[in-house]
Amino acid sequence: MTTQTPQIPETMRAAVLRDTEVGLQVETIRTPHPRTGEVLVKVAACGMCHSDLHVIGGAIAFPLPAVLGHEIAGTIVELGPGVEHTGLKVGQNVAGGFLMPCGQCEACSSGRDELCAPFFELNRLKGVLYDGETRLSTLEGEPVYMYSMGGLAEYAVVPATAVAPTPDNIELVPASILGCAALTGYGAVRRGADLHYGETVAVVAVGGVGTNIVQIASAFGAKQVIAIDVSDEKLAPMKGYGATATINSAKTDAREEVLRLTGGKGVDVSFEALGIPATWTTALDVLADGGRMVPIGLGAGVQTAGVEINRTVRRSQSILGSYGARTRQDLPAVVDLASEGVINYKEIVSKHFSLEQADEGYKALRDQKIQGRAVVDMSL
């Protein structure tokens, strides 16, 4: 049995990708409905992330037509069967996480949501949910595939495992960035690095995810948090988020400056938040002996980065990949940190686009014109 409110329309608007040469175009498609273990969310806003950009540009293969958008906030309007006893309710405001654990596989059973095999095999490769089918279709019944929940639409079906209720003091539109930008930042600091109080940190590339890493690392007690980027505009607000120093690596030798700031040692942990060879090199260059480099940024396609073998071996340095976080445990924690003011999610959102402007917004992101995070705001 499903539980729903009666105001759900039969159709909705969605930004659909049919051709990577054309980009996103708004279409009217059928409003989806949740199946077992899922909820339907009326989307208030959807964050705009580089991962979507890789698909839009064709660098990451994905079945088309598709609705992208993988971090949302909104209101539950329908519960699928089996959700009644989870505590989720119609009318509840929630944040939706991009990494949607199936809850049944070996990784999920051991609490490692970030390694959920069905998520990668079904959703990330085939654009479907865990019964092997998409929830989206055109008015004619043509399947439309889902990148995560397909949040660039007025409504989105999300597994109940990937939503967390938000309290009344959380603003829904900016809260859309909690499900990827903040969740990924939290996972990198808490899970990937296992950051300890008093350690020193460098964050290479301070976009939406990098900015969250800066403030979360500071909140977790890092002694120094050094923000590194090639944009003075992006670096300007970093001290307000907890950075103790900033470095423009286009103007200053990042390694030399980090060594100066750390008394010649380098940092205990460096985070790489863009996914290109240059930022990998910088993140490795600033590491101390025994340091941990945590890459978070996804590369385009099968992009590779070089590692200096002897230095990594002789200096006992570690590279610890971090993808998202453990959604069922960590998304509620991220919401709590935002509610308590530890994560400043509102100011990170620098631009709002309407659904019709989604393609324009991703072009601005591609052209590095977005500071922090932009969102598609369904109220516009």
Question: Where are the predicted features?
Answer:
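N-terminal Rossmann-like NAD(P) cofactor-binding module of classical short-chain dehydrogenase/reductase
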Residues: 271
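Glycine-rich beta-strand-centered segment in the early N-terminal region that forms part
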Residues: 30-46, 59-109, 113-114, 122, ...
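Conserved amphipathic alpha-helix within the SDR
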Residues: 254-264
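A generic alpha-to-beta junction signature in SAM-dependent methyltransferases
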Residues: 195, 262, 274, 287-288
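Mid-domain Rossmann-like dinucleotide-binding core that forms the NAD(H)/NADP(H) cofactor-binding site
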Residues: 90, 154-155, 161-163, 167-252, ...
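Cysteine-cluster motifs in flexible loop/terminal segments that predominantly coordinate metals
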Residues: 98-155, 159-161
